[in-house]
Design a protein with these regions (language model features):
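Membrane-embedded alpha-helical bundles of multi-pass enzymes
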Residues: 1-211
Length: 211
């Protein structure tokens, strides 16, 4: 399979996993802990394909984000209105939210080029949290796809939301995905670091479940 096709496939898989994880769509909340891994792998494939990674990854990221938005917001199309209204009702939020979700991934790439991978991971976490916070406070708020909402069918997992709010779940999901990704990315080159990151991933995943 051509490299570009593999990148597109990985990005699309990420969007599909998020849809399957989402309440009222798939409901497999545990998939949230691995749903970003195909997207992060797509980024690695993109860097290998473009050598120095200078070509934009943004369009590839948008594919997965668009699928996630479309598969979880399709019900806007079910309104009892003319077809034009149906298309606008689903198209505007899906496209708009896809672009907003793409901004943290775009800025992550900029951070990775100038500061390195660790800072890029930190940038993604901070920027995504900031984006979700914005979505809860401005006039165009659309909190439906905030990552922390994925545990809506598993309240026993997130009793601590009373202290952290939904953003605590978002942080949990992001850090777990990034920690697992670090294990995968370093497994062949630095086994010791991979083991350390594996221990971190288990701690990040497990501690909130027993809190």
């Amino acid at each position: 399979m051509p490299a570009r096709a593999r990148i597109l496939l990985m990005s699309a898989l990420s969007g599909l996993l998020w849809a399957l994880a989402w309440p009222a769509i798939g409901g497999f909340a545990w998939l949230a802990f691995v749903a970003w891994l195909p997207m992060l792998h797509a980024e690695r494939l993109h860097e290998l394909r473009t050598k120095e990674g200078k070509r934009a990854f943004f369009p590839y990221a948008l594919l997965g984000l668009f699928l996630w938005n479309a598969l979880t917001t399709y019900w806007f199309f079910l309104v009892s209105e003319p077809m034009t209204t149906k298309l606008v009702s689903v198209g505007v939020p899906v496209v708009g939210n896809t672009l907003l979700m793409g901004i943290p991934w775009w800025l992550r790439r900029l951070a990775k080029r100038s500061l390195g991978g660790r800072w890029a991971d930190a940038a993604l976490v901070v920027l995504w949290l900031a984006g979700e916070r914005l979505h809860h406070s401005w006039d165009l708020q659309w909190p439906w796809l905030s990552l922390g909402n994925v545990f809506g069918t598993q309240p026993a997992w997130v009793q601590w939301y009373e202290f952290t709010g939904m953003l605590g779940g978002t942080l949990w999901v992001l850090v777990t995905n990034l920690a697992i990704n670090a294990v995968i990315a370093t497994w062949g080159s630095s086994r010791q670091r991979s083991l350390r990151m594996g221990a971190l991933a288990l701690a990040v995943l497990g501690l909130p479940l027993i809190a």
